[in-house]
């Protein structure tokens, strides 16, 4: 049985991360994993430093909250990533721990450039964007990959498409979607390795309904299985 740590929390201005964390822990448990919860990176780093987890799932938003749009939230929720937290998380994945990063992960830890190497991509203010929450259709472009085993050719759910991300050239894109009908295809699910750790990023997972949706739940379940097999 693999042990999975679900880190879900951070700024609640647009997401119910507590509900998302519950949904992810429930999904992990349903797939035969032992799941534990953390709501803050400090707690996650302490747990990971103990050496008993096989994978980390990140569904949260810890960032510096630059910009006037976040003035009301910044005092309570702005986050600078301590060096000790960076070292533990990077070492965990680099040395073979798995990572499943959802939705807002490319925005997280925006003061820590290496995090975006770990995830495989980054949100770039002024370039990246997403349309309003709504119905999304994604195309599976790498059906042969274990993360897409048993997933239908096109999936549909209610979520957001993040586009214009700064994506590493060495990731294996598994699914694409468009923000608008005339948009270019945007990578929305990818896999890669960081050190000896396996990583999957899933753009979807805005809320617990998206996580529990059969199409997305299948991807997350497969991702957990893949990242907990040592590369």
Spans of features found by a protein language model:
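A glycine-centered loop/beta-turn motif at secondary-structure junctions
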Residues: 3-4, 8, 166-231
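Short histidine/acidic/glycine/proline-rich micro-motifs that form metal-
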Residues: 10-14, 105-108, 206-210
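Structural motif
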Residues: 55-59, 201
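A glycine-rich, often tryptophan-bearing local segment used as a flexible ligand/cofactor-contacting loop or short
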Residues: 63-149
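Aromatic-Pro/Gly-enriched surface loop or interdomain linker
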Residues: 1-53
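Catalytic beta-strand/loop cores that center a nucleophilic Ser/Cys/Thr
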Residues: 28-29, 117-195
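Cell-envelope and extracellular/periplasmic
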Residues: 9, 60-61
């Amino acid at each position: 049985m693999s042990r999975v740590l679900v880190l879900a929390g951070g700024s609640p201005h647009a997401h119910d991360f507590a509900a998302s964390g519950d949904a992810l822990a429930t999904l992990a448990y349903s797939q035969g994993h032992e799941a534990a919860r953390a709501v803050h990176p400090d707690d996650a780093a302490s747990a990971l430093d103990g050496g008993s987890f096989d994978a980390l799932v990140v569904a949260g938003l810890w960032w510096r909250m630059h910009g006037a749009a976040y003035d009301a939230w910044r005092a309570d929720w702005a986050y600078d990533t301590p060096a000790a937290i960076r070292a533990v998380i990077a070492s965990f994945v680099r040395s073979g721990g798995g990572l499943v990063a959802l939705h807002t992960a490319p925005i997280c830890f925006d003061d820590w450039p290496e995090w975006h190497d770990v995830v495989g991509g980054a949100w770039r203010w002024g370039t990246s964007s997403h349309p309003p929450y709504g119905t999304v259709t994604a195309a599976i472009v790498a059906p042969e990959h274990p993360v897409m085993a048993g997933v239908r050719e096109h999936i549909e759910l209610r979520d957001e498409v993040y586009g214009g991300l700064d994506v590493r050239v060495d990731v294996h894109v598994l699914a694409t979607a468009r923000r608008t009908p005339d948009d270019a295809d945007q990578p929305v699910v990818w896999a890669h390795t960081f050190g000896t750790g396996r990583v999957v990023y899933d753009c979807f997972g805005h809320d617990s309904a998206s996580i529990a949706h059969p199409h997305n739940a299948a991807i997350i379940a497969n991702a957990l299985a893949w990242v907990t097999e040592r590369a």
